[in-house]
Amino acid sequence: IMLEQLFNLVKEASGDAVINNPAVPNEHNNEVVAEATNTVASGLRNMVAGGGLQSIISLFSNKNEQGSGSNSLLNNPIVNMMIGHFSGKLTNKYNIDGTQANNVASNLIPNVLSNLINKTNDPSDNGFSLEGLLNSITGGKTAEVVQEQQNSGNSGFNFQDLIGKFTGGGQQNGGGGNGLMDIVSRLAGGAQAQQQKNGGGGLMDLIKGF
């Protein structure tokens, strides 16, 4: 997914939390939405860069009854990390009171992620896919890994099989050199390169795209 789509998703979710919230000064609405977008994007990217691909996959493939509901997301450490980061930004950058900032973050971030997970899992929504998201986070490394699998004689191998390796579905066996750790570290490398490209990940980076 490109950042623009994520930005629009955040914007859609930000009505009550940001736009109609008197605690967030109106002149900062767009910047706050951009900041939230950046928090989610860089949070996911940092997870992959730190070798946490498995955590992202389980976050996105958790389709049990309330697995991706915004309430159960509050129990997820990745989500809590994002909430803390975003809340800190609101307080430090926009002088929003700590309690209010925490309320905004705890409302907006799980909502956005919940929508993102639902859209990513919705086959009729072509704009969002876990494949597109990971490819964007890793600067194209995900597609590269899948392509290599196909080239090494595993011609039917696709992105679902890659995910299957982590969730226990899909083709477990396939040509050599495709150990899970190898894949995790390749994608981590791609995400690290993207992190560096984006420097501190400020608002301008966000507007320029991943």
Model-based region annotation:
Residues M2-F210:
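A structural "flexibility-hinge" signal
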